[in-house]
Amino acid sequence: LNELRLKSILSLFDGISCLRIALERLGIHFENYYASEIEPNCIKLSKENYDDVIHIGDVYEITESNEYQGIEPNELDLLVGGSPCQGFSLLGNQLNFDDPRSKLFFEYVRLLRELKPKWFIFENVKMSPKIVEVISKILGVEPIEINSSLFSPQNRRRLYWTNIPNVKERLPLKNDIEGKSVFENQDYLPATVRKAKKGQSHRQIVSPNGSKLPCLTYSYYKGVNADGRPGKALLHNFGDYAVGKIEMLSPLECERLQTVPDDYTKGVSKTNRYKALGNGFTVKVIEHILGCIPNED
């Protein structure tokens, strides 16, 4: 079989270049990988892990007057982005399209129309049917819902709009699931499961029998929800309830939940590792989607 080769790729809101990880794992070759990102810690991590990523800065600067920062419109094979989701999500203070952060979606749409990539992927959270309908009309495709639980022990439902054919949510093959546990210390689990109190079921844990974590988001990494309540996903009673011990997942454990290589984010502070991972793709989900690109050579 011929290996898939792409000309140029543009990753908007690139974060820590999770898309680049997926391309590498799939053995997809490319000539240029352009990344638009403004968060310094994310850029630092991307550069530490990959020296072939071309960082082109703010999405607002990728314009015709700036010659699209070197991107040739007729040579772009893949456009990928997941703009900040809080403005769309019903958990995002009901701001929806009025949220300034949602304006980044329209930058994605602008570049989709101006650069005319062969393939595109747009990712976002589950949201109200009305907003889904509006986005679908703008992008010209219906979304596919994929839960990261297909590939790692967390519940992280996301919508993916793409023109890549034959992408669907499906049952994973055995080798899709990471073989090793996400946990550095398994000793916490049995005691935690035994001593969970009634009414505390929202503090889900990944246990050896396959139960799953709730979705990982940045607010959960901070340990609080948007309204100030304790976060669900990363504040876990991995110790003894009787003494009130609460431990967060380690950055390494979070990397494994997001199917990012071990220690990929070790070049920044623990807080910034949590933030970067919480805002990033689950890499194996992106692998699943990219794996459907037809090889037309």
Residue ranges, per PLM feature:
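Conserved active-site and SAM-binding loop architecture
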Residues: 1-297
